[in-house]
Amino acid sequence: LANGRQIEFSDKNLGSVFNNQGLKIGENKSSTLYCYPIHSSLKEKNTLLVPIAGEYRLVLADGTKIYANSGSKIRYPDVFAENERVVELEGEAYFDVAKNPARPFIVKTTQSEIKVTGTKFNITSYPDDGFEQVTLEEGSVQVKRKGEVFKLTPGRQYFLDKKSEEIVLADVDPILFTSWKDGLFRFQNMDMLNLSKKISRWYDIRFDFKDERSKKLRFSGAFDRKSSLDEFVKIMESTTDVRFKLDGNTVFISQTER
């Protein structure tokens, strides 16, 4: 909460949530925090922190649904401003925004500002990733960065390379970037370095590459997020030239010799 007080959500800790003023601001149930509309002039901001190997859903008072992926932070106010609805994201989240043309919905990341009135889209913006992605599934989106505005239509993706600051707009299959919220990992020609980052946030492990060429190997496929780490390793080793060796909380990755 705004004063630093933390409330842990779990299946054993369900029930009402109150803010610093003692006002009931939501209900925690079934891995979802349902926010309630309240009347307050303070407009305090709360932060939802999703741990590594976790995921959570947030339903805002306006009806907007947010699916937060592991290792993500979402900052949102108890009460939205009269002319706009603003939240802040660090990590990855899927947004199903309630339509309200008079009060646009804005997501701020460390790199960009994404503005919509009602739509479905995914944002990936982890601090330790070398990129930021905005993938549009339905509706329309405007991505603003350093004064420049990029408009997306369904099936289009905004990709920012943080190092070079190059921006690429491309046609993609949105399901490849949104299926995580439905319990699936999907990858299409993804290099092993970026794939390992996604996997490490889910299994709470660290990957160590024995050689640079292993990082550049690419993988296409899908598997259930409920799969164990052992099952994931078996899938990868049976479909790629990569070998995994688990030592404690670290997975060493190498390429098989031919």
What are these regions (language model features)?
Residues 1-258:
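A residue-level detector for the "anchor" residue at the start of short, highly conserved motifs
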